[in-house]
Amino acid sequence: APLSGFYGVR
């Protein structure tokens, strides 16, 4: 699951 921001998934 990605973060609440933008770079949750890198």
Curated annotation (Swiss-Prot):
The keyword Transmembrane helix does not apply. The modification Arginine amide is found at residue 10. The keyword Cytoplasm does not apply. One of its GO terms (biological process) is neuropeptide signaling pathway. Its main location: secreted. Keywords: Amidation, Neuropeptide, Secreted. Myoactive peptide. Stimulates the contraction of the oviduct and foregut. One of its GO terms (cellular component) is extracellular region. It is found in: Secreted. This is Locustatachykinin-2.
